Amino acid sequence: MYAIIETGGEQLRVEPGRFYDIRHFASLKSKNLSSNTKILIYRVLMIRNETTINIGQPWLKNAVIKGRILHSHLENKITVYKMNSKKKTRRKFGHRQNSARFVVDSICLDGKDL
């Protein structure tokens, strides 16, 4: 059983009991997310349960993914180097993206856990 959800500008294939990293988590700041914060994700695009497949247009009604935040963290630093040739103009800076790791507890459709 799995579901495809939309969160943080990405589409993820999620299964109960697994954890995932998301960059832009809804409208929550990564610093405000504490450990074991319960979350509900309503943007469910598709649910597959054994032989049945439910597809939303664009999202499924009455479908919810229940989970909790494990922790928020910063991803690895990327270095950006800009240079104009023959001008002696150089600029080097880095960036670390905020990210949150969450675990999927259950997939619910029409109020029932699948």
UniProtKB/Swiss-Prot annotation:
UniProt GO MF annotations: rRNA binding; structural constituent of ribosome
BP term (GO), one: translation
Keywords of the record: Chloroplast, Plastid, Ribonucleoprotein, Ribosomal protein, RNA-binding, rRNA-binding
Localisation per UniProt entry: Plastid, Chloroplast
UniProt feature coiled coil, ranges: none
Keyword Ribosomal protein carried by entry: yes
Pfam family, one: Ribosomal_L21p
Domain of life: Eukaryota
GO CC terms of this entry: chloroplast; ribonucleoprotein complex; ribosome
Keyword Chloroplast: yes
Family that this chain belongs to: Belongs to the bacterial ribosomal protein bL21 family.
Subunit record text: Part of the 50S ribosomal subunit.
Stated role: This protein binds to 23S rRNA.
The protein's name: Large ribosomal subunit protein bL21c
Species per Swiss-Prot/TrEMBL record: Physcomitrium patens
